């Protein structure tokens, strides 16, 4: 049995402390760690995967081409919750096991969602008079690990908290002191602020559309720290043109970022890169959890 080779392939690197933690786990198990950071072009990834037995990734794309090149590969671990960047069918065809690390980044994402909320209600920090979150109705769209952390923080802000989750029993939501609603439509028509936490799936892609967001009350604020694919961008642009009271804040730059930025100055903001999970703590948690999946 050859020594197991573990490749950490991160175009957007982990914090150094996280890499040190991963290295410690991998080397303690007697495996070899290979680090490929900020590789920029796919050719470098294709070269690096050739002799890897396991790969730890972040938002890196693992498609059929990568899997074809990775002849010795057994395991792919996504450090994070969403694994829409991995071609699962191709992985199955190559007998490669795909794992994720749910829950490790949740608090980091939830805190950022509140940073975006405060920024929006305080008029992008431009010094003019804004509004407060206290007493406002917050809708949490999908009550998973991140959604639960958002609810916890919202209690401290004194918000009235609602949630909709098609897969989470009402009792689970309500025992947290959160009001469970029966549909996405009800959530959007009830809440002043909606925080999106749905994964990108065939069912959810483009589901956040004109008809749904238009149900929001006057001054509605949509915060997206989930995935850009869930937003129907053309319809959201049309709606925000018609309704100048709506705001959209996200940490995933839309494909139509330039259009949003040009048309909706003062009520739209996007971070340059997906950054909800970009904290040293979340990096360490997710990176070490990923390493533990392998060893």
Predicted regions and their residues:
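Phosphate-coordination loops involved in phosphoryl transfer and adenosine-cofactor binding
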Residues: 3, 73, 134-137, 210, ...
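C-terminal helix-to-coil terminal segments
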Residues: 5, 10, 17-20, 28, ...
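N-terminal glycine-/charge-rich "phosphate-binding" loop or analogous flexible N-terminal tail
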Residues: 2-52, 160
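Rossmann-like adenosine-cofactor binding region
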Residues: 50, 64-67, 168-262
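NAD(P)-binding Rossmann-fold cofactor-contacting core
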Residues: 156-174
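Glycine-rich, N-terminal phosphate-binding loop of Rossmann-like dinucleotide-binding domains
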Residues: 10-11, 57-59, 80, 196-198, ...
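Glycine-rich NAD(P)-binding loop of Rossmann-like domains
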Residues: 120-156
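Phosphate/diphosphate ligand-binding glycine-rich loop within oxidoreductases
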Residues: 34, 53-130, 232, 256
């Amino acid at each position: 049995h050859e020594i197991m080779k573990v490749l950490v392939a991160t175009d957007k690197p982990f914090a150094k402390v996280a890499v040190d933690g991963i290295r410690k786990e991998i080397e303690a198990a007697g495996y070899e760690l290979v680090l490929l950071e900020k590789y920029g072009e796919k050719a470098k990834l294709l070269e690096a995967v050739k002799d890897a037995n396991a790969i730890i990734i972040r938002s890196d794309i693992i498609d059929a081409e990568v899997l074809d090149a990775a002849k010795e590969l057994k395991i792919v671990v996504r450090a994070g919750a969403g694994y829409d960047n991995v071609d699962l069918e191709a992985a199955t065809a190559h007998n490669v096991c795909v794992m994720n690390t749910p829950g490790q980044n949740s608090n980091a994402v939830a805190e950022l969602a509140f940073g975006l909320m405060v920024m929006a209600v305080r008029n992008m920090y431009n010094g003019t008079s804004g509004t407060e979150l206290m007493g406002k109705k917050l809708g949490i769209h999908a009550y998973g690990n991140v959604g639960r952390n958002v609810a916890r923080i919202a209690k401290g802000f004194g918000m009235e908290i609602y949630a909709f989750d098609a897969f989470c029993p009402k009792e689970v939501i309500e025992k947290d002191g959160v009001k469970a609603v029966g549909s996405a439509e009800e959530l959007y028509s009830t809440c002043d602020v909606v925080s999106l936490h749905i994964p990108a799936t065939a069912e959810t892609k483009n589901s956040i559309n004109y008809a749904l967001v238009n149900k929001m009350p006057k001054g509605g604020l949509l915060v997206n720290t989930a995935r850009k694919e869930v937003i129907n961008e053309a319809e959201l642009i049309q709606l925000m043109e018609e309704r100048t009271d709506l705001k959209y804040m996200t940490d995933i730059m839309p494909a139509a970022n330039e259009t949003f930025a040009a048309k909706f100055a003062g009520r739209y903001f996007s971070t340059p890169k997906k950054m909800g999970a970009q904290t040293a703590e979340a990096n360490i948690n997710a990176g070490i959890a990923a390493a533990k999946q392998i060893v």
